[in-house]
Each structure stands twice: as C-alpha cells, then as structure tokens.
Amino acid sequence: VDKYMGDGIMAFFENPPDGVISAQAAIKSAVAMQEKAIELDEKYKVQNRFPFSVYVGIATGYAKVGNIGPPEKVDYTVIGSVVNKASRLDSAGNAGDILMDEDTYFFVKDDYDIEDFGSHELKGFEKKVQIFKLTI
C-alpha cells in the first residue's frame, strides 16, 4: 500500500519489465479485497449498518517510482499516466467491480473470468480506454 486517500487506497506492485508478476499480484489482491468486502457487507446488513463496498481499478504500465517531493516532505511513491488510469478505472465502475485496462487483461486473461466492459472516455486520456471487468 502506497498511501491512503480519503476513503481510498493506492497500491503498486514492482517487478521485472514484463509486467506479468505485478498484474497477477494486483488481481490477487483485488479479489481478496472484494471477498472480504462481501463478507463485511453481509455482516453489516445483519447489524443494520451502512452497506460496505469496494471499487477497484487496475492499470499495468511504466511509472516513475521513488522518493518524490521537496526535502521537507519526501514521499516514496509512484507517479505517471498509468497511476491516473488506475484511478479513473476505479471511478468508472460500480460497487464491487474490479476493472482493468487492456495491458492488465493481457497478463491475466487465462486465469480469471473476465468480460469486456467496453471502451470508455476517461478524464485525462485523449483516446477511449478499453476496459475489462473481472467477475468473482
């Protein structure tokens, strides 16, 4: 986990240049989060509490990783368009969705039940982005 932002978190997975390991790790983490969210939601319903849900956006690609910021506030983090894409994917879905870009899909398509979610305009991206949805 890189950071907490309001009711969200940002996590990244580093690996060799091929992207396979990080894409698989991100999907495994997303599935684990969604399974726990479903469990908590069921528990909360019995207790008459607010619903609990998680939105997940996963993008695979190159980013700048390292200590970023002025000396008085250096933060080890990740920046780049792939980070922005993951955030936009997160916002494009509904409660319980695990959405991914085409690059992530390429690395995990044989291991999971994934459907085409269509091409969508995402803020900050000139071209429509092909989105895929993982079903758990």
Predicted regions and their residues:
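Conserved helix-loop-beta segment at the catalytic/binding core of cyclic-nucleotide signaling proteins
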Residues: V1-D18
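Helical mechanochemical/support elements of P-loop NTPase systems and associated helical scaffolds
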Residues: M5, S22, K64, V78-K85, ...
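Cytosolic regulatory/linker segments at or just downstream of nucleotide-handling modules
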Residues: A63, A92-I136
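Alpha-helical scaffold within the catalytic cores of cyclic-nucleotide enzymes
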Residues: N15-V56, T60, S81-D90, N94
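Active-site loop/short helix in cyclic nucleotide turnover domains
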Residues: F13-P17, K64-G69
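Broad gene-expression machinery/nucleic-acid interaction feature
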Residues: G8, P51-Y55, I131
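Residues that recognize and position ribonucleotide moieties
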Residues: D2-K3, V56, D97-I98
